[in-house]
Amino acid sequence: MGAISQERLLKVILAPVISEKSTRVADKLNQVVFRVLPDATKQEIGAAVASLFKVEVAGVQVLNVKGKVKRSGRVMGRRDSWKKAYVTLKPGQDIDFASGQ
């Protein structure tokens, strides 16, 4: 496989995941958590974070989150499944979503 196109890198990351756990791993393990495209690879995610946020990536771990079964009145429905990526940054690197930088 050749180089990843810049257009693909801009589409890979959908949104940061802000939760108690993501805040905890950001402080303790220097990781940031993103919601990504379901077909994104670890290499694409790492390259996208490095190019978009101008940081050095040490590693990427991904997991598929299954959609929960939810009820709306009598009807049972299912939320969409999605993919989550934990991106470990090299020491000294930081992405701060709270300040918008």
From Swiss-Prot:
InterPro entries listed in its UniProt record: Nucleotide-bd_a/b_plait_sf, Ribosomal_uL23-like, Ribosomal_uL23/eL15/eS24_sf
MF GO annotations: rRNA binding; structural constituent of ribosome
Keywords: Ribonucleoprotein, Ribosomal protein, RNA-binding, rRNA-binding
Gene3D superfamilies membership: 3.30.70.330
One example of a Gene Ontology biological process annotation: translation
GO annotations of cellular component type: ribonucleoprotein complex; ribosome
Family: Belongs to the universal ribosomal protein uL23 family.
PANTHER family, sorted: 60S RIBOSOMAL PROTEIN L23A
Subunit structure: Part of the 50S ribosomal subunit. Contacts protein L29, and trigger factor when it is bound to the ribosome.
Function: One of the early assembly proteins it binds 23S rRNA. One of the proteins that surrounds the polypeptide exit tunnel on the outside of the ribosome. Forms the main docking site for trigger factor binding to the ribosome.
Protein name, UniProt field: Large ribosomal subunit protein uL23
Species this chain originates from: Thiobacillus denitrificans (strain ATCC 25259 / T1)
Lineage: Bacteria, Pseudomonadati, Pseudomonadota, Betaproteobacteria, Nitrosomonadales
